[in-house]
């Protein structure tokens, strides 16, 4: 049995698991493992962004694109505390990475050394991470590392993915023990649970009784890589498909059966189909408030009058918000395959049966298109939001990976963007973390070096993490940041106008008391960092500027001035209790 230092064991294990990157920042608490990483630098690359939260967002986005985990590394105290946001973001959206944090040495536990959390328990950092990771491990000796590493890797990627924390006292990196590398993990994607025969038969019976079915697909569909099967099922039966943001791309956004997102900022056809359906087959979504119009009957859904088949790999999500008529614990890909295979057992389940319903849905699609399309050609300055989305849809290639930060721009993309491929539209949906898109796009680029990676980010979100330009220049990452510059925290400013009669305070950026709107020159900022920078204030310049940025194959910021006073047309609702909710701007609720 070889004698190894703890840091060597961790580095060798990551190499064995074919982890290509470790994102993190040095500190006195992890310097002991850096030497071990030096020895494997040709197989495991350390990339140091300028903030730990950014490291986590990069790792999160890497997994969303490639469905293979990487690792992060942080030092004791503040460095590791900065991981809370990115772990919460990943956990909320079922994304996985190995979060290695460092802690004070075991010989100093409970003595209040530099950066120890000790008020309730010695070296208590694992309790900080507990709510934001799938599991936390705290091996305090080198001989505890093999088991902890294997369990951490398996826990992270099996079932519903999630980040896992490995919190290590920094003496363990340098101490030695007689240890073996743990065996390689073979669990990732190896076990896909399916439905039992009775559940498949019941799902068929519900389909046979339905006249107006819809599919509602979410991140569980993306994680199981079920796009091909879902598209086949939808096409075979002529069933329209509603998507959550993290399910977008599983069926092409421009497919005739794709209705888009649902909820307040969803598309009108999706809300109309959702609230009028007599059967909803839900594949890997949890019906959060934004995709259910805050659970108000008739705005997006009409449960329990509408029958519900709820399929999810995580039993905790079945019935969380709506009690299903049939709850199925299964991998989405396996379940849809089972359903397709069993369809011949029920001859009455056919596209002909649902054709009148589909014709009705197509009418809603035509109405919505007639309502929104004229604004996609509006040539105004500052640029109209629909024009920006439409231009990017036209000039960006089908294989683009789009990373979206939180902000009002995200609402516009939810409503109108048509993702052409799965795992290509990255959102912080569950936790809505500002900075995710700004930082995550670099992780996406590392996961898919041959594909264009573009982040659309707000001016507020970008100024939370402007240091990303340094990392992109250092590592020659040709990512493009499109800054949606409306001189405001636009999403919250819109709430003030919609719910508080426009009593604007604290939601826009002004220079002193002059009333002059203020932001830095983002393009000059980019150039100062060694990246390319452009400013777009005229609509006729946007398309060519984006195309040039992609052609240059260099880090680039495009500062786009967007009209802050044009708001997405709501087609559902969303409530901030106890404030009364608003009626849709387009369409009306329908209560079955």
Specify the residue positions occupied by each region the protein language model found:
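Generic enzyme active-site microenvironment
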Residues: 310, 403, 456-457
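Short beta-strand segments
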Residues: 167, 403-405, 559
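Active-site diphosphate/adenylate-binding microenvironment
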Residues: 7-11, 15-19, 33-38, 362-444
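Conserved short loop/turn motifs at secondary-structure junctions
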Residues: 218-223, 377-378, 458-460
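A short, charged, Gly/Pro-tolerant segment at domain boundaries
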Residues: 165-174, 357-366, 563-566, 574-575
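Internal, active-site/partner-interface "lid" segment
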Residues: 145, 348-369
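N-terminal alpha/beta PP-like core and its mobile active-site loop of ThDP/TPP-dependent enzymes
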Residues: 1-353, 391, 395-398, 471, ...
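Thiamine diphosphate
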Residues: 108-120, 271-276, 320-321, 327-329, ...
């Amino acid at each position: 049995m070889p004698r190894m230092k703890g840091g060597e064991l961790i580095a060798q294990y990551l190499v064995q698991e074919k982890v290509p990157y470790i994102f993190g920042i040095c500190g006195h608490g992890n310097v002991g493992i850096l030497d071990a990483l030096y020895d494997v630098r040709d197989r495991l690359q350390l990339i140091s962004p300028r903030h730990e939260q950014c490291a986590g967002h990069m790792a999160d986005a890497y997994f969303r694109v490639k469905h293979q985990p990487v690792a992060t590394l942080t030092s004791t105290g503040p460095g590791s505390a900065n991981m809370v946001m990115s772990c919460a973001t990943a956990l909320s959206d079922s994304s996985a990475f190995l979060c290695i944090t460092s802690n004070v040495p075991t010989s100093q536990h409970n003595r209040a050394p530099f950066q120890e959390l000790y008020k309730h328990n010695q070296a208590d950092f694992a309790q900080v991470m507990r709510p934001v990771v799938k599991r936390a491990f705290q091996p305090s000796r080198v001989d505890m590392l093999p088991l902890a590493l294997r369990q951490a890797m398996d826990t992270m990627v099996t079932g519903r993915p999630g980040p896992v924390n490995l919190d290590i006292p920094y003496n363990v990196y340098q101490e030695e023990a007689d240890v073996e590398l743990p065996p390689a993990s073979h669990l990732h994607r190896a076990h896909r649970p399916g439905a039992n025969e009775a559940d498949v038969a019941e799902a068929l019976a519900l389909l046979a009784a339905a006249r107006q079915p819809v599919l509602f697909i979410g991140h569980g569909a993306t994680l199981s890589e079920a796009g091909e099967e879902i598209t086949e099922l939808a096409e075979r039966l002529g069933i329209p498909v509603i998507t959550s943001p993290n399910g977008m791309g599983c069926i092409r956004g421009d497919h005739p059966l794709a209705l888009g997102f649902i909820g307040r900022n969803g598309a009108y056809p999706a809300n109309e189909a959702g609230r009028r359906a007599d059967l909803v087959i839900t594949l890997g979504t949890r019906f959060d408030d934004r995709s259910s119009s805050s659970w108000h009957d008739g705005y997006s859904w009409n449960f329990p009058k509408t029958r519900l088949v709820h399929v999810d790999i995580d039993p905790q999500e079945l019935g969380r918000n709506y009690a299903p008529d049939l709850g199925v614990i299964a991998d989405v890909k396996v379940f849809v395959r089972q359903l397709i295979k069993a369809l011949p057992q029920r001859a009455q389940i056919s596209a002909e049966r649902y054709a009148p319903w589909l014709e009705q849905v197509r009418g809603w699609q035509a109405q919505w298109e007639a309502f929104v399309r004229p604004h996609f050609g509006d040539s105004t300055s500052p640029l109209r939001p629909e024009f920006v989305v439409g231009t990017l849809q036209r000039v960006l290639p089908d294989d683009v990976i789009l990373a979206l930060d939180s902000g009002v721009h995200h609402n516009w993309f939810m409503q109108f963007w048509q993702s052409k491929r799965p795992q290509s539209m990255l959102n912080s949906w569950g936790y809505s973390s500002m900075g995710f898109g700004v930082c995550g796009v670099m992780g996406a680029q590392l996961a898919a070096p041959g594909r264009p990676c573009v982040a659309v980010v707000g001016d507020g979100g970008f100024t939370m993490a402007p240091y990303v330009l340094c990392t992109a220049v250092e590592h020659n990452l040709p990512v493009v940041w499109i800054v949606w510059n409306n001189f405001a925290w636009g999403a919250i400013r819109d709430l003030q106008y919609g719910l508080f009669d426009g009593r604007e305070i604290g939601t826009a950026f002004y220079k002193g008391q002059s009333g002059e709107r203020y932001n830095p020159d983002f393009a000059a900022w980019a150039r100062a960092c060694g990246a390319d920078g452009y400013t777009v204030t005229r609509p006729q310049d946007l398309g060519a500027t984006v195309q040039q940025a992609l052609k240059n194959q260099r880090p680039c910021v495009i500062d786009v001035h967007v009209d802050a006073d044009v708001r997405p047309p709501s087609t559902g609702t969303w409530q901030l209790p106890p404030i009364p909710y608003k009626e849709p701007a387009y369409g009306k609720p329908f209560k079955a």
